[in-house]
Amino acid sequence: MKKFIYILAAVALASCGNKQESSNNEQAETVEVETVEVAPAADLYLPDGTVHNLDNANLYAPGVAVPNLTVLDFNAVWCGPCRQLTPVVEELAKDYEGRVTFISVDVDNYGELFEAYNLGSSIPAVLILSPDGNKASYVGTGDLLPKEKFAAILDSF
């Protein structure tokens, strides 16, 4: 039994010594850091003729300036009226390519952004933001369908 205790003590001391050495080695290592230029996040959402799915709520938080006319379409996959509006938004994104940015905002994932704009509790809700700070909101599809109604609203900005 005494042999076992001596062996256990020797193993414990040996492992402590190795731990200290590796700790010293870690401190001696240098790390090379590479600087990478990253495009501004706003460049992710350009008026390129597509509807972008929001992946960063901070980009369009209340009070944030937008570089061009921007449509935030607050919707959910389970919402029938939202599914009626989606093809119209996609067509308008193509029609207004280069002029208007279209963003689809899933309220199940970004409910706090929806609430931050005080748009009520119904969807679909569309918020139009202009670079000069003006905004307009529409709840439901009555003012936005057919497509020509929605286009007239965009043209009024």
Task: Mark where each language-model region is.
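Short pre-active-site segment immediately N-terminal to redox-active cysteine/selenocysteine motifs
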Residues: 68-70, 74-78, 122
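Typically the conserved alpha-helix immediately C-terminal to a functionally engaged Cys/Sec
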Residues: 82-96
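Non-catalytic, surface beta->alpha helical segment in thiol-disulfide oxidoreductase systems
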Residues: 128-157
